[in-house]
Curated annotation (Swiss-Prot):
Gene3D superfamilies: 1.20.5.1930, Histidine kinase-like ATPase, C-terminal domain (3.30.565.10). This is Sensor protein VraS. The lineage of its organism: Bacteria, Bacillati, Bacillota, Bacilli, Bacillales. Pfam families: HATPase_c, HisKA_3. It catalyses: ATP + protein L-histidine = ADP + protein N-phospho-L-histidine. Signal peptide: none annotated.
């Protein structure tokens, strides 16, 4: 813009210099008709000298108005670029059809790095937000896990022990000679206590699931089955093939196994549960099957938290999750997870 201002100033200086020269010549050469006519002839009743000044002033006003319009265009464009920058958009110079002054370009070249820095700050803010979300998610999960552990300890130390004591007392009472109707009621009470103990063990397994730690999936399932065989009246058996399972899916499969056994203990009313794990070359098959009362899959699948949790865990590892259950014929849960041969045998 400076070169426009300098041009106007130079033009004014030139015109007034010429007028001064004409005036000087008029004083010296008063007999020259041209200069006399120049300074004494009138146009529209206005001396030529004054008329020329008015023309020059009018031209300056017109040129100044044009420059002011262009400057306003520059300011509007810069304002738009700043607003776009504040909104996170990338500013550019290719989307406008106005003439850019050197001063505006200087300001624009200052704005571009600021826009880039602002974009970086926005990305950092998003990353921090995501990190905070992940941290909060981990904290929430940790709080939930701690609360589950606390509830499991309280149930084990109080209710579970009381149920055990009640079971022992009822067993001792059964050894004595009972008169009717106690001889019929005591066995019923004993059965109720045993069912409560079974329900309690299933709840404890759900609230305080065992981790694999340094064990493989097969070893973890075997240890789980052996532990349950000592604590529950239901027959728990396993058939586990010895093969390497990718670390990324082992924990999910183990938690699915725990959840399935817990549901079986609590709801199946069966006498036997079987856990099977097979290597089918390109996929593994995990199957948990019982001989209980069965249920309507369509009704239970959306209502049961345990079933939905198992299905979600299977989907997270790219596995398929199927349930087959028939009334009085038991329930079979199958999980098929794809195996990557290279990952399966990596240490």
């Amino acid at each position: 813009m400076n070169h426009y201002i300098r041009t106007i100033g130079s033009m004014l200086i030139l015109v007034y210099s010429m007028l001064a020269a004409f005036l000087f010549i008029d004083k010296v050469f008063v007999n020259i008709i041209y200069f006399q006519g120049m300074f004494y002839t009138q146009i529209f009743g206005i001396p030529v000298f004054l008329f020329l000044n008015l023309i020059i002033i009018l031209l300056c006003i017109i040129v100044g108005s044009v420059l002011a319009y262009k400057i306003n265009q520059q300011n509007d464009w810069i304002k738009t670029q700043i607003e776009r920058s504040m909104e996170g958009e990338t500013v550019g110079i290719n989307d406008q059809n106005i003439e850019i002054y050197s001063e505006t370009l200087d300001l624009y070249h200052t704005l571009v790095p600021l826009n880039q820095e602002l974009h970086k700050l926005r990305l950092k803010t998003q990353n921090l937000t995501n990190e905070n979300y992940n941290i909060n998610d981990v904290k929430v999960k940790k709080i939930i896990e701690d609360e589950r552990q606390r509830l499991a300890r309280e149930l084990h130390d109080s209710v579970s022990q009381q149920l055990f004591a009640a079971s022992m007392m009822l067993s001792a009472i059964k050894e004595t000679k009972l008169e009717p109707p106690l001889d019929q009621q005591i066995p019923i009470l004993e059965k109720m206590v045993q069912d409560s103990q079974l329900e309690m063990r299933a709840l404890l397994l759900h609230l305080r699931p065992l981790g694999l730690k340094d064990k493989s999936l097969g070893e973890g399932i075997k240890d789980l089955v052996i532990d349950l065989q000592k604590k529950v009246p239901m027959k728990v058996v396993h058939e586990i093939q010895d093969f390497k399972v990718p670390k990324g899916i082992e924990d999910h499969l183990f938690r699915i196994t725990q959840e399935a056994i817990s549901n079986t203990l609590r709801h199946s009313n069966g006498t036997k549960v079987t856990v099977e794990l097979f290597n089918k070359d390109d996929y593994l098959l995990l199957r948990i099957q019982d001989n209980g009362k069965g249920f309507n899959v369509d009704e239970k699948l959306e209502q049961s938290y345990g079933l939905k949790n198992m299905r979600e865990r299977a989907l997270e590892i790219g596995a398929t999750f199927h349930i087959v259950s028939l009334p009085d014929s038991g329930t079979r849960i199958e999980v098929k997870a794809p195996l990557n041969k290279e990952d399966s045998y990596d240490d």
